[in-house]
Structure formats: structure tokens, C-alpha cells
Amino acid sequence: MVATTVELPLQQKADAAQTVTGPLPFGNSLLKEFVLDPAYRNLNHGSFGTIPSAIQQKLRSYQTAAEARPCPFLRYQTPVLLDESRAAVANLLKVPVETVVFVANATMGVNTVLRNIVWSADGKDEILYFDTIYGACGKTIDYVIEDKRGIVSSRCIPLIYPAEDDDVVAAFRDAIKKSREEGKRPRLAVIDVVSSMPGVRFPFEDIVKICKEEEIISCVDGAQGIGMVDLKITETDPDFLISNCHKWLFTPRGCAVFYVPVRNQHLIRSTLPTSHGFVPQVGNRFNPLVPAGNKSAFVSNFEFVGTVDNSPFFCVKDAIKWREEVLGGEERIMEYMTKLAREGGQKVAEILGTRVLENSTGTLIRCAMVNIALPFVVGEDPKAPVKLTEKEEKDVEGLYEIPHEEANMAFKWMYNVLQDEFNTFVPMTFHRRRFWARLSAQVYLEMSDFEWAGKTLKELCERVAKGEYKESA
């Protein structure tokens, strides 16, 4: 039986919600197109994203169709809708459609890669990663090492920001050299497109190139990627790349595109969890799914991964279309967000009397996120002293200090106050004893939002300096 696209319940209503003529001007006037609470100022788009009302209507239409006729929809219509979104995202990324499938999030994609790789039995394989790796992916590496009982190990590459791209490249080459000198085999590298904390653009293109030269598998964690930066997959040609669509592409949570070039698809034998598409090496179990026709085993494997709601995946094509028709396309969107992040971050730094996290070549803010130093530092940890550089020592001068043992208490207090009193959220971290706040630019924000953020953070920091965070302990 060949499934064909059918008109879905609520489809006309959803289409009507997308009839806005564009491109619309960016800034706060665009907020009416989104489902955000008017009382909430979303300065942290990078963590979970959000969606336009038009895409929410699309999501509901797919869910309604699934409930109206469960078996026909899940068995026959789902593969068609997945193919439509796969075609749309492949066109956006300029890659062959047979190289892309969907998973729930980037963490699942990284897990899928690391748990499918067959590690060498001689125990020499190493996984390389930077110390700015996303926490869940770092723990995935830890799990794989435990699960494989010693046949694979890891090597963490420390970075000191604001690092130059050349410094990152040099650190990676040095890690490869040390690995081999110690009798190890650098087998796979996990590489960010934009790291989480701090939120900075990473020279992933250069690192992938080195991986090719050194015959190391490149696994690119583009959790912060599609919809924010040009991934240039065709030029970069990574071995694996995963990018969350629900963060910057305006698709519902959770949804990520998983890119695997044909040359590597044989390495990904199982989805997570293993489902009907798995082909065992021994035996032949019954597969109850509708035959996939001329699709590859890789694509067929990811069409049904247990009974889950795939509606966010179906919305990818709708989100791409909405961004083109209403917002004017990817280039216009990215240009606005990057400019706002750079200029808005500088404004916040001026209000706080600090600085943004940027290197001398200006490569860290080639994205929609910016990190601003807060006007205090964390006291030295006697168990793990950090030797600051001359530049860092100068930055510390004249700032007040939070004792190391009170840092987490201050973090928790600041988060609670931002949420409860200011109706916003700003992720913060400390790197090299310095507190940093990460802000996300987006098309529905403008400079006034960053000015507000600067004043809010200034008030918050003044209250921290007075020790107010201790009162809630």
C-alpha cells in the first residue's frame, strides 16, 4: 500500500494561522506571533527554544489526526510526513535527503553514536572532548567507558577563555599527540558547534578537518546550531552531526536532525531504544511495520522508534516554511540575531562596568548568544587552586568576591530572584573564578531587552554584594 498525503483535521485553521505576510520587522512587535507569556521576558531562548503560534497550531493538527485514526496515521501517514520534513531539512542543510533522520534531541543523537561504535578490543581507543562539553554528553562518555569495562578511555582537553580559534586547534593537536605518545589511539572526538556554558562559537570546522587528517571519527554536537549558524555540512563533511531543531528553528520540543553520511550509516545499527528496524546479525525476527519501499536500512530504522509522538518532527517543514515566508529566510534571521547578541551584550557590559567574553579576532560571538562578566568573582578553591593569567588578575582587581563555598548558594538565590521577582531567567556559570551571564538574542527581542537585562543584573549583583543570598540559606 502506498500512503499519500491527506488533509489533516485542523489543517485549514493551522494554514490560516500562517497567512501572515512577510517579512515582518524584527523586535518586540514580533512577540504577538509567539506563544510566550507577555509578562515573561525570554532572554534564554538557547536552552529550550519556543515556537510561533502558527507552528503550535500545526502541532495540534498532527496530534488530532493521530488520535482521530490511530492505526492508519501511525502506520501509513507517519512515514510520509517524516519524509516531507526530512526533505525540507535536507534542502536547508544542502545535504542528500538519505543522510538525515530525526531524533528527540542532541543528547540522544550523541548517545546513539557513542553506543553504536564498536570499540577496539585492545583497549587503546580514546574519546577526545573539550572541558566545555555539554554535561549530559560528558556523562554519556563516562557511561560508555564504564559499560565497555576498560576497552575505551577518554581524554579531556581544557580551554581557557577567551581563547583564540588557533589556541583551540593547537590544544586539540596537542591532545592527539599526547594520546599517541601514551600508547593510546584517538578514535573519536565530540565537538561543539556552539558550546553551552559559556555560550561561544566553536571552531568546529577546523577540528573536523583535523579529524579527517588524523583518521579520527568526528561527532559534532550541534545542539546549538541549525537556525542560528550556518553549519556548512557539505564543506565541513563531519562523520556525524546532530542539531536541535527545537532550539533555534522554531519546531516543538523535542526534535533534532541527525546527519549521517552514507559512508557511515553501517556504523549506526540500532536506534535508542532498539526497535523494529534493527537487523540482527543472527536470526530473522518478524518486523510488523509497513515495508519501507526503496528506503535505506538507516532511514527505515529511524521511522519507528517505539510508540512516541512524532508530531514535532512533522513540524520541521512547517517551521522552515514559516521562517522563509514570515521572517524572510535564514540569512536575514541569523544576521539580525548575531548583530543583536554582539551589540546587546556590549550594552549589558557597559551597564555592569565589565566586559563581554570575546577574543581578539572576534570569533566567539559569531552566533546568537553572548556572555557578559558579572562584577564579582569566586574565591579560590583551596582544594583546586586556579592560577589566573595576568589579564585575568587585572580583571579581578576592584571586584568583590564570593567565597568559594558560597558560590552555589549565590547561584541558586540569583536564579530564584530572576524567576520570582523579574519574570525572566538568565543562565550563569563561573569560568576561571569569574561569574558569567549568558544571554540569547532572538528575532522577537531588541536592544531595549538587553538594556533591561543589564539593569536587572546590576541590581541583582548589588544585592549579592550585600550578602542577601545568605538570608535564604
From Swiss-Prot:
It is found in: Cytoplasm; Nucleus. S-(hercyn-2-yl)-L-cysteine S-oxide binds at S47, R438. Its main location: cytoplasm. The lineage of its organism: Eukaryota, Fungi, Dikarya, Ascomycota, Pezizomycotina. Catalyzes the conversion of hercynylcysteine sulfoxide to ergothioneine (EGT) by cleaving the cysteine residue at the sulfur atom, the last step in the biosynthesis pathway of ergothioneine. Ergothioneine is an unusual thio-histidine betaine amino acid that acts as an antioxidant against peroxide in conidia and contributes to conidial longevity. Keywords: Cytoplasm, Lyase, Nucleus, Pyridoxal phosphate. GO terms for cellular component: cytoplasm; nucleus. It comes from the Eukaryota. Pfam families: Aminotran_5 (PF00266). One of its GO terms (molecular function) is hercynylcysteine sulfoxide lyase activity (ergothioneine-forming). Ergothioneine (EGT) exhibits antioxidant, anti-inflammatory and cytoprotective properties, leading to its growing application in the pharmaceutical and cosmetic industries. Also shows UV and gamma radiation protection activities. Finally it acts as a cation chelator and a regulator of glycolytic metabolism. This is Hercynylcysteine sulfoxide lyase. It catalyses: S-(hercyn-2-yl)-L-cysteine S-oxide + AH2 + H(+) = ergothioneine + pyruvate + A + NH4(+). Its EC number is 4.4.1.-. It is an enzyme of class 4 (lyase). Its cofactor is pyridoxal 5'-phosphate. Belongs to the class-V pyridoxal-phosphate-dependent aminotransferase family. EgtE subfamily. It comes from Neurospora crassa (strain ATCC 24698 / 74-OR23-1A / CBS 708.71 / DSM 1257 / FGSC 987). The keyword Repeat does not apply. PANTHER family: HERCYNYLCYSTEINE SULFOXIDE LYASE (PTHR43092:SF2), L-CYSTEINE DESULFHYDRASE (PTHR43092). Pathway: Amino-acid biosynthesis; ergothioneine biosynthesis. The modification N6-(pyridoxal phosphate)lysine is found at K247.
